[in-house]
Curated annotation (Swiss-Prot):
Keywords: Cytoplasm, Methyltransferase, rRNA processing, S-adenosyl-L-methionine, Transferase. S-adenosyl-L-methionine binds at residues 104, 123-128. Belongs to the RNA methyltransferase RlmH family. One of its GO terms (cellular component) is cytoplasm. It catalyses: pseudouridine(1915) in 23S rRNA + S-adenosyl-L-methionine = N(3)-methylpseudouridine(1915) in 23S rRNA + S-adenosyl-L-homocysteine + H(+). The lineage of its organism: Bacteria, Pseudomonadati, Thermodesulfobacteriota, Desulfovibrionia, Desulfovibrionales. The gene is rlmH. Homodimer. It comes from Nitratidesulfovibrio vulgaris (strain DSM 19637 / Miyazaki F). This is Ribosomal RNA large subunit methyltransferase H. The keyword Cell cycle does not apply.
């Protein structure tokens, strides 16, 4: 069974995002070892740059030296679902390195985290709330798994 990590800022607070994330995590865990690591949100009273830096420091501390860091970033490369599946397949060829998909908080990812990235991926040209972005990423990971297994989920 291949492994992947999801590293994100904060817990999902909205019940329907919690349910959607749990749904895709459950499906993914049938064929993948998925580790979800959440770091604490930055203090909302702080200016956005300071909040981002604090969250970034926590994200960096949670990364392992062998992690293949894939940052979800609006300036990243956009992939079709099939291209993303092929990328996931390539990222998991080496059993000693684990792809770690990183999602920032309300203000995205700090530059220090982006500098640690092996790869930056864009979910699309539109901006999503970070809770929605997490669910979209989980769905796309599940879809990629189905594409790789030739499951009928993706038409």
């Amino acid at each position: 069974m291949k492994s992947l990590r999801l590293l994100a800022v904060g817990k999902l607070k909205t019940p329907f995002w919690q349910q959607a994330a749990a749904h895709y995590l459950e499906r993914l865990r049938h064929t993948w070892r998925v580790t979800e690591t959440l770091v604490r949100d930055g203090d909302a009273a702080l200016p956005p740059a300071k909040r981002n830096a604090d969250e970034g420091a926590r994200l960096l501390a949670a990364l392992g030296p062998a992690d293949i860091v894939v940052c979800m970033d609006e300036r990243g490369k956009a992939y079709t679902s099939r291209e993303f599946a092929a990328l996931l397949d390539r990222l998991t060829e080496n059993a000693t390195a684990v792809p770690c998909f990183v999602i920032g908080g309300a203000y995205g990812l700090d530059d220090a985290v982006l500098k640690r990235a092996t790869l930056r991926v864009c979910l699309g040209p539109m901006t999503f709330p970070h809770e929605m972005a997490r669910v979209v990423l989980l769905e796309q990971l599940y879809r990629a798994d189905c594409i790789l297994r030739r499951s009928p989920y993706h038409h």
